[in-house]
Swiss-Prot record:
Belongs to the small membrane AKAP family. A lipid is attached at G2 (N-myristoyl glycine). It comes from Xenopus laevis. It comes from the Eukaryota. This is Small membrane A-kinase anchor protein.
Amino acid sequence: MGCIKSKQDCTVHKTIQLTRNQEKDEMHNKELVGLVQANQEDSKLCSCSASPLLLEYAHRLSEDIVNKAVRQWAEVDSKYSDIPYIESDAI
């Protein structure tokens, strides 16, 4: 049998997640402003290599995407974790 989860714990958890998401969105917006300013300066130089700022931003963005995907998987998994998995030998 699955365990019963407290509704209060879920609301606290969701509140914490919303706060974290808002903080990340604010940081993301600040990074975009810095990136646009850096790109304007770099366009004057016309260098062929990627700027370290751009590479760092891409790395952080990819980590953020993976973190969101894992969080989404965990939320879906927690919704359905109390439903038992039934294996069937029938084809």
